[in-house]
Amino acid sequence: MIAHSPSAPFPKLSPEEYLQWEERQREKHEYFDGQIYAMGGGSKNHSVISVRLSTLFCNHLDGGDCEIGNSDLKIQIVNTQNYTCPDVSVTCDPRDRKSTQFITYPCLVVEVLSPSTEAYDRGGKFRLYAHNPMLQDYLLVSSTSVEIDLYHKNDDGDWLILNYQASDRLELKSIGLSFAVDVIYRGLAF
């Protein structure tokens, strides 16, 4: 058994050890090149936004072949042994049904931004996801203002960044869904 105290660094683990260890943890951790990184808790807005997006996706995709995951569902970064914990993910790829611990081929990944993770979500984490041939949409949703950035991969394989704000309508081509931005932020205080 691997023990960890808050003051000690996480031990370096193999991917298999990480997945076994992570199943027994209360908190979520991402895994990158043998290192474990604790994922902090989110704000009330963060939680509400994640639930609303998950519900929206579930209602839209109900009865189909796609699966929607919350932050408990890890993504294995394609062609690596690294794992992330996005706030919401959608996969429609049958290869992802083989694992009970993670998916590898999402078509949509959502990160609800926190001040402490925003730079990583926009930079390093996007670069990890961008190499996935199945990923079409990467949605970055602010939890401190009404603003959403959609990174959409076009037919040429180029990533376009589209910004949405209050009263805009957002389209996720990856799952064939269009919705009003205001639906996600209704009643939230900033």
From Swiss-Prot:
Top-level taxonomic group: Bacteria
SUPFAM superfamilies membership: Restriction endonuclease-like
CDD domains per the UniProt record, alphabetical: DUF820-like
Family of the protein in this entry: To Synechocystis PCC 6803 sll1609 and slr1290.
The protein, known as: Uncharacterized protein slr1290
